[in-house]
Each structure stands twice: as structure tokens, then as C-alpha cells.
């Protein structure tokens, strides 16, 4: 009985520690080391946009060989990361308790609810349901739907604002316009006061 509050506190601390690693554990995808402008993609990897990023990168390198392209995961809000991390740990704890057959409600002096009795009679199904239901919620918390593009730290496309991915033609047109604009700005004489 004494270990229950301590283990809950320890589990919560582990969840917060693993979710607080913000960008430290995020793998950056650098496709080439060039000297030109920097095109940066922030994408939702769990949404399947990594393949789109790789296809766009190949096509853009063929068209603009001097461009630098980087891609990284667009992280959700910290609250959602903490919820997903907590669910991940809680899921493992709950599956362990189901497999061991220990009644946590008896430790608290409560009568076990019907769903707990069912989970003890059907351990495999109960563990599968906990695993898949928890994974569904975790994925929902971690999915941002983002496909954000910046050129030299200037936003040029946002799927979060537009609601759709840019076509390759749209992306090339945007890059052409941005590069022409920056070339035009570089050729202007400095303003004297």
C-alpha cells in the first residue's frame, strides 16, 4: 500500500523527464551540404510526410543544385507530448498489472469493477485493447499535420494555414519568386540617410 503513491510519483517524474527532451532527440534530416540558400522543412513524420519531403528534396536538388535542404519533425505542443509520454508509461504499467493478475482496487479497499473482472478473465484481449487504444491516443497527441517550409528563415508555405500540401509546381513557383525577390533586394543600392 505504501509503494503505490511512490510508484505513481516515480512514473510521473519519468514521463516528464522523457517528454522534456524537446528537440534534443529529434533527428534532423540533412540531405546535402551546399552553399546556397537554406530551404527548411518542418514536417509531421507520423503523418507520413517524410516520403513527400524526400521526393520534393530530390526534385529540388535537380532544379537547384546549390540549395541546402534540411528537414525536421514539427513537434506538437508540450502538453500533448507530456500526455503521450504519460500514456506510454501508463499503458505498460496497466498491461503489467493485468498480466500479473494483481487487483489494484483491493489495495485501495475498493470492489473491482466489472471491466477489471473481464480483463482478468480475458488477459490477452484486455492487453491488446489497452495497447491499441493507448497507441491510438498517443498518435493523435503526437500528430500535428504540419508541413511548414521556410527559405532562409522566411516562411514560404504552411500546411497548417493553407490546409493542403503544395504541389511541386507551386513550390517551384514560390521558390522562383522568393529567389528573384532576394536577388532584387541584393542589387538595390544601400539607402543613405
UniProtKB/Swiss-Prot annotation:
Alphabetized GO MF terms: thioredoxin-disulfide reductase (NADPH) activity
Bilayer disposition of the protein: Single-pass membrane protein
One Gene Ontology term from the biological process aspect of the record: cell redox homeostasis
InterPro entries, per database record: Selenoprotein_Rdx-typ (IPR011893), Selenoprotein_T (IPR019389), Thioredoxin-like_sf (IPR036249)
Post-translational modification remark: May contain a selenide-sulfide bond between Cys-44 and Sec-47. This bond is speculated to serve as redox-active pair.
Endpoints of the signal sequence: 1-21
Protein's UniProt keywords contain Oxidoreductase: yes
Primary location: endoplasmic reticulum
Annotated S-S bridges: none
GO cellular component: endoplasmic reticulum membrane
Residue location of crosslink Cysteinyl-selenocysteine (Cys-Sec): 44-47
Domain of life: Eukaryota
Coiled coil, from the record: none
Subcellular location: Endoplasmic reticulum membrane
Tissue: Expressed in embryonic olfactory vesicles and the photoreceptor cell layer of the embryonic retina. Low level in embryonic epiphysis.
Name of the top EC class for this enzyme: oxidoreductase
EC number: 1.8.1.9
Database matches in Pfam families: Rdx
Keywords, in A-Z order: Endoplasmic reticulum, Membrane, NADP, Oxidoreductase, Redox-active center, Selenocysteine, Signal, Transmembrane, Transmembrane helix
Record's catalysed reaction(s): [thioredoxin]-dithiol + NADP(+) = [thioredoxin]-disulfide + NADPH + H(+)
Similarity comment: family membership: Belongs to the SelWTH family. Selenoprotein T subfamily.
Functional note: Selenoprotein with thioredoxin reductase-like oxidoreductase activity.
PANTHER family: SELENOPROTEIN T, THIOREDOXIN REDUCTASE-LIKE SELENOPROTEIN T1A-RELATED
Protein name: Thioredoxin reductase-like selenoprotein T1a
Organism (species): Danio rerio
Amino acid at each position: 500500500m505504501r509503494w503505490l503513491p511512490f510508484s505513481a510519483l516515480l512514473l510521473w517524474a519519468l514521463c516528464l523527464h522523457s517528454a522534456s527532451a524537446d528537440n534534443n532527440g529529434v533527428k534532423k534530416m540533412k540531405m546535402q551540404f551546399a552553399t546556397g540558400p537554406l530551404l527548411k522543412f518542418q514536417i509531421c513524420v507520423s503523418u507520413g510526410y517524410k516520403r513527400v519531403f524526400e521526393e520534393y528534396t530530390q526534385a529540388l536538388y535537380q532544379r537547384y543544385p546549390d540549395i541546402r535542404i534540411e528537414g525536421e519533425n514539427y513537434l506538437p505542443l508540450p502538453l500533448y507530448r507530456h500526455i503521450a509520454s504519460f500514456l506510454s508509461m501508463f499503458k505498460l504499467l496497466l498491461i503489467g498489472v493485468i498480466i500479473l493478475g494483481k487487483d489494484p482496487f483491493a489495495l485501495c479497499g475498493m470492489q473491482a469493477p466489472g471491466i477489471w473482472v473481464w480483463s482478468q478473465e480475458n488477459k490477452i484481449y484486455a492487453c491488446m485493447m489497452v495497447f491499441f487504444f493507448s497507441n491510438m491516443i498517443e498518435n493523435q497527441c503526437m500528430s500535428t499535420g504540419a508541413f511548414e517550409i521556410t527559405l532562409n528563415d522566411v516562411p514560404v508555405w504552411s500546411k497548417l494555414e493553407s490546409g493542403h500540401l503544395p504541389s511541386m509546381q507551386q513550390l517551384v513557383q514560390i521558390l522562383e519568386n522568393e529567389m528573384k525577390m532576394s536577388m532584387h533586394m541584393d542589387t538595390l543600392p544601400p539607402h543613405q540617410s
